[in-house]
Regions:
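C-terminal luminal/periplasmic domains and tails of membrane-associated envelope-modifying transferases
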Residues: 2-3, 417-629
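Polytopic membrane enzymes that build or remodel cell-surface glycoconjugates and lipids
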Residues: 2-445, 453-464, 470-472
């Protein structure tokens, strides 16, 4: 059946509303879940910062990740929350933020529908439009999208795909109707996509390649290359402009891959296996296959994907059908960087080398594959019945698994525990440290001691468990226990300044000030030794962990707590001389000056501290008011 243009528009509005209604029908309850986040830097540096400090907080956060669009959407959430509550409609910010995530995801599902229509050049055919819509529902309910939808701080993936799909659609329009305005939109949308997530760089190659494949059998090779060259150059230039701007804000981060070829090969195959299983068989809990480092299974799955790629290539050359080959290249392009991440040994800047959310955009390929299946197996009744039955089975299974995974995001405690408890790197933290905290809350010291001893047996060298034992024995006033674990910590961390600094701060927290001083003195001695060794070989010290200004700052706190205010002031000033942007050192120096009765000088230091770090504004303003009374 052929639709008119107006009927086609009505159809598109209807399917968007149907998709939105379907998703809310199954997942409306998640709007009432608490805030979950896996990004402490975001929470501390942006979400909690006062209004006039948002800009500087996003700048500080950009030292790690450059996500300006992401921050703007969170500010939009805050603004909408304010408008609703100002109008008398009481609503939590978490509900607004979660609704924004759902809105973005459903919109991406609709863009997948439009994208498939564009690559197939299907305009107003009702039957094909329905099949494309059914295929887009696979994207909508695919289980690996769970974290993107239900976790507020992983919105950048959906934003990146949103702008990426719009870029793709405009490029397809431009391929058949070249206009200057299209080039402007392409550059802007691709720039916004990169600002949301750098991993969408793959579109710079995938978009021209897709257009090339679509035209391969229609025009000659030279003309085909010319048709794509302008878009390819535009996307590359946009990327280089973005990357230059990003390099201005972010700090340099060195990553190191595994040295051994065997290790590289092993992690290439196992990382590929992780993402291929997540894409094609997402019906197990993620960590069932995340912790499975079976190389044989990984090679088998990779081989199956190669066979599928060969089949798609056969259809392209012999049947002139580019659809499956486009899906192959989409999977390869979108998963290249995530697989490379899996081969990083040290210095990876994100939370985990392997994460399902990194492959959010690759789910588009699954919708393309399902459209091909529904389209090519609907010519005969029995094939149509088989295809639709298979589709319904997969769709309902996806909804069921996605519903089950949504329960992880009830609150942040559940989220952090459930998502990491089976991770081989984090099992010691979550199997016993979480029950320990619960036992303390419930005043159940038997359960606390049981989990503490189990925690220690898992990893006797882990600093967290040694400090936990110290905390316990200090509470129990058990001198023998304290001595044993102090010696144990000394044995494990005597040559590691960052470990010694942890112990010093632990002592400060427990008001063991002289012990804390002694530990910091040990670090200074080690630094003097390191400095002499490097200077003897003509090298220069550029970075220390912990930084020297932090050592003086900690000494200042200790002297302040001991009421040795003159010495504390000297330490805080030294920290500020070493690091002029150490606003907290200035702030504490101001408090010390107030203790010494120098109110005028204290007021000036408060103002200097606020100028460097507006986060201190509210507290400092109160103290200034008190000082001037």
């Amino acid at each position: 059946m052929k639709l008119t243009n107006s009927q086609n528009k009505i159809f598109e509005y209807c399917i968007y509303l149907i998709a939105f209604s379907l998703f809310l029908f199954f997942f409306k309850h998640t709007l009432d879940y608490g805030r979950t986040y896996d990004d402490d830097a975001l929470l501390d540096q942006f979400t909690r910062s006062p209004g006039d400090a948002k800009l500087i907080s996003s700048f500080l956060y950009a030292k790690f990740h450059f996500y300006p669009v992401y921050f703007l959407t969170h500010e939009l959430d805050n603004f909408l929350t304010f408008l609703f509550n100002f109008s008398g409609i009481e609503i939590l910010n978490t509900k607004i933020a979660k609704f924004t995530n759902i809105f973005l995801h459903v919109t991406n599902s609709f863009l997948v529908y439009l994208f498939i229509k564009k690559i197939l050049r299907i305009e107003n055919n009702l039957r094909d439009n329905i099949l494309i819509f059914l295929s887009s529902l696979i994207f909508l309910f695919h289980p690996i999208t769970s974290q993107i939808i239900f976790n507020i701080t992983t919105r950048n993936e959906s934003l990146a795909l949103f702008f990426g799909l719009l870029t793709f659609i405009y490029c397809l329009n431009n391929a058949y109707d070249k206009k200057f305005i299209n080039y402007l939109f392409i550059a802007l949308l691709f720039f916004l996509s990169l600002c949301s997530k750098l991993m969408t760089i793959y579109l710079a190659g995938l978009i021209p390649l897709t257009i090339f494949l679509l035209n391969f059998h229609q025009i000659n090779l030279k003309e085909n290359f010319k048709k794509n060259f302008d878009v390819f150059i535009l996307l590359c230039v946009t990327f280089f402009v973005y990357y230059y701007l990003r390099s201005v804000f972010t700090e340099k981060n060195d990553i190191f891959f595994y040295d051994s070829f065997n290790d590289l090969l092993f992690y290439f195959f196992t990382s590929s296996k992780f993402y291929l299983i997540g894409l094609f068989y997402p019906f197990e809990h993620i960590y069932v296959y995340a912790t499975n480092y079976d190389l044989n299974l990984a090679i088998i799955l990779f081989t199956l994907f190669i066979i599928y790629s060969i089949f798609a290539t056969y259809l392209f050359f012999n049947k002139r059908d580019p659809i499956l080959l486009i899906s192959v290249f989409w999977i390869i392009a979108s998963l290249t960087l995530p697989v490379i991440f899996g081969m990083v040994d040290k210095g990876f800047p994100l939370i985990s080398n392997l994460a399902e959310r990194y492959q959010y955009s690759s789910v588009v390929a699954i919708s393309i594959i399902f459209f091909w299946i529904l389209k090519n197996l609907s010519n005969h009744l029995y094939k149509k019945t088989l295809a639709l039955s298979f589709y319904c089975l997969i769709l309902f299974s996806c909804i069921f698994i996605l519903y089950d995974r949504s329960k992880v995001y009830i609150d942040n405690y559940t989220f952090m525990t459930e998502t990491d408890e089976k991770s081989p790197k984090n099992v010691h933290r979550y199997s016993f440290s979480v029950p320990m905290r619960n036992a303390v809350k419930n005043n159940d010291w038997t359960a606390y001691k049981f989990n503490l001893y189990q925690f220690y047996q898992l990893n006797t060298k882990f600093d967290e468990v040694i400090l936990e034992f110290l905390r316990y024995f200090i509470h129990e006033e058990n001198e023998a226990g304290i001595k044993f674990f102090e010696d144990e910590f000394e044995k494990q961390f005597k040559d590691k300044p960052y470990g010694i600094f942890k112990l010093a701060r632990f002592y400060v927290f427990n008001e063991e000030y002289q012990k804390a001083k002694n530990e910091i003195k040990k670090i200074f001695k080690q630094y003097d030794k390191i400095k002499k060794q490097l200077e003897a070989s003509g090298k220069k010290v550029t970075f220390l962990d912990p930084p020297i200004d932090d050592l003086y700052f900690e000494l200042g706190k200790i002297n302040f707590y001991q009421k040795n205010y003159d010495k504390a002031l000297e330490n805080f000033k030294t920290a500020n001389v070493i690091n002029p942007l150490h606003a907290t050192a200035l702030y504490n120096a101001a408090i010390t000056l107030k203790k010494l009765g120098l109110n005028k000088e204290a007021t000036q230091l408060y103002k200097d501290a606020i100028e460097i770090n507006p986060f201190l504004r509210e507290t400092a303003n109160n103290l200034i008011a008190n000082t001037n009374e």
